[in-house]
Structures are given as C-alpha cells and as structure tokens.
C-alpha cells in the first residue's frame, strides 16, 4: 500500500539568536526541524516497507521573512530573481540541516519528495532555486544511492524521478489533487 504524507506551512527561515522580542520565533529552539525528523521516523515505523510520498505543499520556506545580516534580521525586499532567491535559500538551508536530513532519509529509502510552491516560497518554481535545493540534497545522499556514482546522468535521472517540483498543484498517482490554496 502506498502512503502520502502532506505537510505545508513550515515557513523555514534563517535562524538568529539575537534577542529582539519580535524575532524570538526565529531562535533555533523554535525551528521545526527535529519535529519533522521525528514525524518521518514515526511514519516509517507505522508503514514498514510500504512506499511513501512526502508532499511539501507550499510555504515550506519563507522567502518573505527578513534575512539575517550580521546576526540581525534586516528588512529587505523579497528576492525577485533566481540568483537572489538561490542565495536566500542557501542561507535558509544552512540553518536547517535536520530538514535536509529528513529529505535525504525519504529519498534514500527510494521514496518520493514533492514540492508544491506556495505564496511565501513561489521562488521554488525558478530553476536556479530548484537546483540550489537539489545540489544541497545531492551532496548529502549516501554514495550507495547512485547506481553508478561516476555518472552524473544516472544520478540526475534517479533524483529527478524521486524529487519533483510543481508551481501550482500536484495530482498524486492516486488522483488526489493537492495545492497550497493561496490562489483563492
């Protein structure tokens, strides 16, 4: 039996330990990464060897939250280009290694990860941003993940089958229509 786990609105952001009261939610202790890892492990304990499809349904990242510069949240416009958004995503990912570990866990087992863009991470529809995330995941996949570690084509083919991006909605193999819903 195939299982689908749908999560949305994690709003991963750059973390800061600065003591601004209005930005306290950005402290590492409030990041949802450890809970996500625990959730994935609980799901795997329940489903055994059945296949899993993890659908990350929008606002997984939050490109609108001010970036951290010199330890402080600094108001800045949302990234508009692939280059700007990739740099922002790389900074976010630097603070969320456990999130990447959870994705690697799912992919390493041969399961799928699907990203659907939301209103706070619409930049995921940009190829440069997708490649930034793919590169981070690829760098942490075990060597045994690839059929032929010397072949980048094999690596890309397998990863592109298991890790997919959709700009608006996703239709699962079981016919379930999944969208973030910010269009309404």
Which residues fall in each region the model found?
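Extended recognition/assembly regions associated with phosphoester-bond processing machinery
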Residues: 1-184
């Amino acid at each position: 039996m195939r299982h689908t786990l749908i999560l949305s609105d994690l709003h991963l952001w750059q973390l800061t330990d600065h003591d601004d009261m209005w930005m306290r939610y950005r402290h590492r202790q409030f990041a949802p990464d450890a809970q996500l890892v625990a959730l994935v492990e609980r799901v795997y304990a329940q489903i055994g060897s059945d296949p899993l499809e993890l659908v990350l349904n929008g606002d997984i990242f939050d490109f609108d939250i001010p970036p951290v510069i010199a330890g402080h949240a600094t108001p800045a416009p949302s990234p508009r280009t692939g280059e700007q958004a990739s740099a922002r995503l790389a900074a976010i990912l630097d603070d969320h290694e456990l999130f990447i570990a959870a994705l690697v866990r799912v992919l390493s087992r041969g399961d799928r990860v699907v990203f659907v863009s939301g209103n706070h991470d619409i930049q995921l529809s940009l190829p440069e941003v997708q490649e930034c995330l793919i590169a981070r995941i690829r760098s942490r996949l075990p060597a045994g993940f690839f059929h032929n570690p010397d072949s980048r084509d094999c690596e890309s083919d397998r990863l592109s089958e298991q890790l997919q991006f959709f700009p608006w909605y996703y239709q699962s193999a079981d016919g379930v229509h999944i969208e973030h819903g910010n269009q309404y």
